[in-house]
Regions:
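Hydrophobic, lipid-facing positions within transmembrane beta-strands of outer-membrane proteins
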Residues: 26, 35-39, 49, 119-123, ...
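Membrane-embedded beta-strand positions of outer-membrane beta-barrel proteins
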Residues: 28-30, 41, 53, 125, ...
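Transmembrane beta-strands of outer-membrane beta-barrel pores
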Residues: 32-36, 55-61, 140-146, 231, ...
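Structural signature of outer-membrane beta-barrel channels/translocons
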Residues: 42-44, 126-130, 228-234, 298-302
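Repeated loop/turn-to-beta-strand initiation elements of outer-membrane beta-barrel proteins
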Residues: 49-51, 132-136, 235-238
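Bacterial Sec-dependent N-terminal signal peptides
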Residues: 1-23, 297
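Feature captures outer-membrane beta-barrel proteins of Gram-negative bacteria and organelles
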Residues: 39-52, 56
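Extracellular/periplasm-exposed beta-strand and loop segments of Gram-negative cell-envelope proteins
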Residues: 25-30, 60-118, 145-220, 250-288, ...
Length: 302
């Protein structure tokens, strides 16, 4: 970051030193690369300084995944729990019973859909230290803080899961029928969800929509540092630019609904020492920069 501030200072000094050589030209361009489809407008102050501003449209790519649905500690799967539904319902009032039909149709895995959401805007300053096409570039990208969202693919999928989880919570309440409590305890019946590292992921048992989602969050403001070839506005009618650099978007966070120690909450997940998916949490938390590799065609207006 100190290097970025140093370069920004160099830009300001260069602008001041070259004020008498002010010779602006304007252009528009389109590009493609790791930031998506890039559309921007550009201006050159002189042979040494160029400025670009625009938008980077990232396609909303969707990825499907299957996650095992099982209980927290005992790791019982759905098929092992179906035999207990009628026994549990015997201790519940009509409004709180588990739908045996819905629960019996519940699959062993839940289908999730992940969606990329990373369309950004940018303001970049190109610095040509040698009056050639080679340049250094500083600036910033601006985008959403939630760049990836994961949702249950089937709306209302968690209805029988929530009914089951509410029943387990009911058995643990003070004043619950002792026979009900013993049924749950003696058979190691626990809440249903998915394990991710040291966390137990499950929807809010009181959510009327019976859905759940998780997100990966980064900083919306992302300083940029890079290098490349080509001018913001070419000296001829048509030119090209090549960019190689990184966005500094901070330490990513995985935000998900959890139920641990009897409390439901939406929290930032931290990598632990064990559990399914813990390696994924560790990897995600280490990716503090986003690589930028773009190729751009630019046309000179005047």
């Amino acid at each position: 970051m100190k290097k970025l501030l140093t370069l920004c200072s160099f830009v300001l000094l260069s602008l001041g030193a070259s004020a008498q050589a002010f010779d602006p030209h304007f252009g528009i361009g389109v590009g493609v690369g790791t930031t998506g489809i890039d559309i921007d407008a550009s201006v050159t102050i002189n042979d040494y300084i160029g400025i670009r501003g625009g938008v980077d449209i990232m396609p909303k790519i969707k990825i499907d995944a299957d996650v095992d649905l099982k209980t927290d500690g005992a790791n019982k799967k759905v098929g092992e729990l179906k035999q207990y539904v009628n026994q549990i319902n015997a201790y519940l009032p009509a409004g709180k019973q588990i739908s045996a039909n819905d629960f019996n149709q519940l699959p062993e895995k839940m289908k999730l859909e992940g969606k990329l959401n990373n369309t950004t805007g940018h303001i970049l300053i190109d610095i040509h230290p040698f009056k050639t096409s080679f340049r250094l570039t500083v600036g910033a990208y601006f985008g959403p803080d939630e760049i990836i969202g994961a949702y249950n693919k089937e709306d209302g999928f968690f209805k029988p899961v929530n009914q089951w989880n509410n029943a387990i919570i009911e058995s643990q309440q003070p004043g619950a029928n002792p026979a009900f409590t013993n049924l749950v305890k003696n058979n190691n019946l626990e809440m249903l969800g998915a394990k991710l590292g040291d966390y137990f992921i499950t929807p809010d048992a009181n959510d009327p929509k019976n859905n759940a989602e998780a997100n990966i969050k980064v900083n919306g403001f992302r300083p940029y540092l890079g290098l490349g070839f080509g001018r913001a506005v070419p000296k001829k009618r048509i030119g090209c630019q090549f960019d190689l650099g990184v966005q500094f978007w901070g330490k990513p966070e995985v935000i998900a609904p959890t139920y641990d120690n009897g409390t439901f909450k939406v929290e930032s997940l931290k990598a632990g020492n064990s559990g399914d998916g813990d390696d994924a949490l560790k990897t995600i938390s280490k990716i503090s920069v986003y690589p930028v590799l773009n190729f751009r065609l630019v046309g000179r207006i005047f």
